[in-house]
Every structure is written in C-alpha cells, then in structure tokens.
C-alpha cells in the first residue's frame, strides 16, 4: 500500500490502477479468511463432538425395579468416591474418604464445611447420581447401587441452587414435580411455596410462558423448585440451601416454603447459613472429604471443635460493619 501510494504520487501509475489492484487483492484474500474461520469452527466442533461421544459412551447406571425400603433412613457406610477414571479403570482423585453418617427419617441433617469438602458430592451420592467407589449408601436398608435410578428417584425431591426452567408456562414448570397432578394440586403446591405473590404480577398468571430458564429472580426460581418438590411429596428431600444470595423479602418467602416442604421428611441439606444449621437435628462437618465431627448443634458447640469455630467465624463476619 505504501509503495503503491508512492508510485501514484510520483505519477508512475494512475490512481484508478492502484484502486483496481487493491480491490482485486481484497477479493483474492477473502476466501482465505473464510477458510481460516471455517477451520477454526471445525476444530471447535470436533472438540464438542468428542465431549458428546464421551457422554454417549458412558455406561448407563443399572439396577433392579424393586425398591421396598424399611423406612427412609439414608446411611453412608464407609463411603469413598473419586471423579473420573484412569486408563486402568480406577477412580480419579478421591473426593470422599471413609465417610459414615446416618440421616434419620423425620429429621434434618445438615452438611457443613468449606468449599470443596464434599458436601454436594454426598447429596448426589445419596440419590445415586453417581455410585460410590468404596463402601455403600443405603436407604431403608437397601443399597442404592442395586436399584434402577429412575425407580429410586421416585422417593426423592431435589431442590438445588441451579433451578432449571423450561420453555413452558409457570404451571407446566411446576407440574414437572408430578406429571399426573391436577391443576388444583399444582396450584395448591404453588400457594404453599409462596409463588402466588410473584405470579400475580404476570400477564397471564400461571399460564404465562416463562421461556427456557426464564427471566425470574433467584428467589422466584427457588420457589418454583420448592413447589415442584411439594407437589411430588417424596419422603426424602435433598436441599442445597440458596438463601445466601437472596434479598431479605425473598429469603423469608423461601424459608416459609421450605418449612412446609421439610416437615416429616428425611432431609439432607447442604447448609450455608447458621440459622439453618442451628435448626437442624444433626450436623455433619466435612473437611477434605472426611467427616471431621457430627452430632447435634448443641453438642458440637459444646465440644468446641471445627463446627464451633465455623459458627464463631460466621457470627463475627455478620457483626462486621464498614
């Protein structure tokens, strides 16, 4: 370009000749740019295809169709677990090591511990999202690894922080908890979960389309998830407490809905707030994939161990002001 400009300035070539040359060069290089972009997209597609193939090749969890537990106590018996597997088929890095505790029917068992301690993994193993690599998880005396996951999950209601909404109405999203539920049953569950308050502001009420993952606030999404669980009315509830990120009004609404959901159930809650922990019947403190201590909140506070230290730190941070 600089040489061409110099030649035009010196009169050696005409400006239109220079312009035609530049136009021709741009036309020649355009297909190369497109080819490079296409190659980049092909590499990205290949990477995605590999991930999809790995998912499709993952063996399906199998088990019997009979599930007749005696009660709904959830027992972890010397459980170990590691994500992934190496070429030799052995599990990857251990996330849980020799974890043993019992979540009693009719009680709230709170799992507490620092990030990465294994709380979420325990909740997922309880519902057989994965199988333990050592030890066993039982429900009412039945080893969950022997039960078909679809059959097992009929006895579970799951309320995790990442609430999935679908391209459907509010009522349709709540009905996912139990597909054969009547409209009256869906509305009753929604009212019990305090959904009426925000649904009333929608143009078509419970018939409003909310779209895939929707535009609802965190508290509103959480209440829809609780309504699903109330509608299902399963004897075991797995709850990943999400109130830490909610405003005061939404937190109050969610807590009221949870109190209705948890009554009389076997509850395993991944706890983040001390108010939840203090109201639990049992606390299991996890650290580095092991049970550091367990007992009632009062017992653990009196013992002055890991749990007492965590409570003191949270109370100290709550009292801190700018």
Task: Go through each PLM region and give its residues.
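ABC-type nucleotide-binding domain
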Residues: 69-322
